[in-house]
A protein has these predicted regions:
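A generic structural motif
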Residues: 45-49
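Short Gly/Ser/Thr- and Asp/Glu-enriched loop/turn motifs at secondary-structure junctions
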Residues: 40-44
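Short Pro-Cys-Gly-centered "Cys-loop" motif that presents a nucleophilic cysteine in a tight turn
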Residues: 1-38, 50-148
Length: 148
């Protein structure tokens, strides 16, 4: 999980969200990363991850660094986008992971000004893929939660 500096919008357009997904895809194949759920908001992202190679810091440095470089280049800006490195909490792959996924998927409707009325309507979340309303992205690992 990471939030932007000062609530700044870091996903201002569909192209920004897609660029982040492209970087996640690259990280999955390059570092063996497994993404069990995701939800991107305009100023933050949430990702329950598994790093079988024990390389979480390297993976997150890659994701945050590459996205920041691309964002700054496209928007002719400079400086950090995100507060600090990232926030990580160890979660066991059982009911706790399922509950975390539910909390993450609830983000777009649980905020003060909901972005959508129903989880399924939010395109920047893995929820539509879980309920077969959207095709899962090639790098997305939904097996762990489906078997929980």
């Amino acid at each position: 999980m990471n939030r932007s500096v000062a609530g700044r919008s870091v996903f201002a357009s569909p192209a920004c969200y897609q660029a982040f997904f492209d970087i996640l895809s690259e990280a999955c194949f390059r570092y063996g990363l497994m993404v069990h759920a995701y939800c991107l908001a305009h100023n933050q992202y949430h990702l329950p991850l598994k790093t079988p190679k024990g390389n979480l810091s390297r993976v997150m440095r890659h994701i945050n660094g590459v996205y920041t470089q691309r964002y700054n280049h496209v928007n002719d800006t400079h400086g950090p986008l995100f507060k600090g490195r990232f926030k990580a909490v160890l979660v066991e792959p059982d009911d706790a992971l399922l509950k975390l996924s539910q909390l993450i998927h609830n983000r777009p409707i649980a905020i003060k000004k909901p972005v959508v009325k129903h989880w399924v309507d939010y395109p920047w979340s893995s929820y539509p893929a879980y309920i077969s309303k959207a095709a899962p992205l090639s790098w997305f690992s939904q097996d762990t939660l489906c078997n929980a």
